[in-house]
Amino acid sequence: MPYKVPEIYYRFEPQTFYITSPARASNLQLINHNNILVKAGQVTIVSTGIIFPKETSFAFILYGKSAKSIFCHTGLIDPGFQGELKLIVLNKTEDDITLFENDLRVSVTAFVYGVPKLHDYSDLCPPRYSKDAGFDLYLPTDVTVKPRVPNRYSVNICCPAQLKSYKPVLFGRSGLAAKGLTIKVSRWQNQLQIIFYNYTKSQITYTARTRIAQVVFMHKKHLPTTLTRLKPTMHLSENIKYSWARVSFQDIKTFPVQDEKLYSSSKDTSDSQMSRGDAGLGSSGLM
C-alpha cells in the first residue's frame, strides 16, 4: 500500500502574519505583513495566529529568522498543546528595532519523538503533562549567566536515559526565554554542555535544581549527519542539521473535517497526567 502522509489540521487567524507555504506543505511557513517593534532590553512575544486544535503524535518546532539583529527562541511545541503558537523575539542590540513587512520569516515543522523510561531522576524529570515531548533538565550546580555574551556551562554527566534510534536534544525553556534567557539548541552526547545567552542587562544566577532546559528524544532520521539532497533541511544551530517529518499541514477552513476527528477525547489523557491544553507557550509554560 502507498504511504499515507499524516494530516495535521490547524486554524489560522491572520493578524501579524500571512501563510506563504502551499496547501498540504510539510513546512508551514509564514511571513509578517505588519510591523513589529522589538525593544532593546525587552522580550517581544509575537502571536502567529496558528492553533493546532487536535493533539497529534508529532512534536513541533517553531523557528523564526530575520536579517535584522534579532534572535528568535527556537520553540519546542508539545503534541498536546492546543493554544496559539507564539514566537519569542529578542533584540541583540542596544537600540529598538522595527521589523517591517516581510522582515520576519517563521516556520512550523513536525518531528517524531520518543519517551524513554528513566532509571535516574537526579537530572531529568519526566514530562509533566499527557503527550508532552520534553523532559525537564535540572541544573546540577549553581550557574551565573553574564549579560550579552555567550556563557558556556559544561559538566561531565551522560544522559540518564537511552532510547534506540532516538537522540537527546536540548532546547531552551520558553518560560526562561520569555524572561530573556536563551539556550543554544544542542545534542547531549558524552557530556552535558549548555550555551546560555542572557539578553537582559543584568547578571543572573540560577541555583542548582532549577529547571533550566528541555530535553527531547528526537528520531535520528531528523538529524542527518551526511549530505541529504533528497530531503529538505534547516539548521537549528550551526552544528545541528534538522530534517523535518513528511506531513500534510491543512487549514481546517479549506479542508473541513468532522468534529469528532478534530477534537481529542478525554479518554486520550491518562488518569495520572493532566492535559496541557493551552497552558504556557507550547512546552515549558511561563514559570
UniProtKB/Swiss-Prot annotation:
Known catalytic reactions: dUTP + H2O = dUMP + diphosphate + H(+)
Keyword 4Fe-4S: no
Cited InterPro entries: dUTPase-like, dUTPase-like_sf, HSV_DUT
GO annotation terms (biological process): dUTP metabolic process
Key word Transport present: no
Highest taxon listed in the record's lineage: Viruses
EC numbers, comma separated: 3.6.1.23
Annotated substrate binding sites: R173, S174, G175
Gene Ontology molecular functions: dUTP diphosphatase activity; metal ion binding
Gene3D superfamilies the UniProt entry points to: 2.70.40.10
Matching SUPFAM superfamilies: dUTPase-like (SSF51283)
Top-level EC class: hydrolase
Keywords attached to this entry: Hydrolase, Magnesium, Metal-binding, Nucleotide metabolism
Region of interest called Disordered, as start-end residue ranges on this chain: 264-287
Cofactor field: Mg(2+)
Pfam name, any one: dUTPase
Start-end of Low complexity biased regions: 264-275
Its biological purpose: Involved in nucleotide metabolism: produces dUMP, the immediate precursor of thymidine nucleotides and decreases the intracellular concentration of dUTP to avoid uracil incorporation into viral DNA.
Family indicated by similarity: Belongs to the dUTPase family.
Protein name, as recorded: Deoxyuridine 5'-triphosphate nucleotidohydrolase
Lineage: Viruses, Duplodnaviria, Heunggongvirae, Peploviricota, Herviviricetes
Gene: DUT
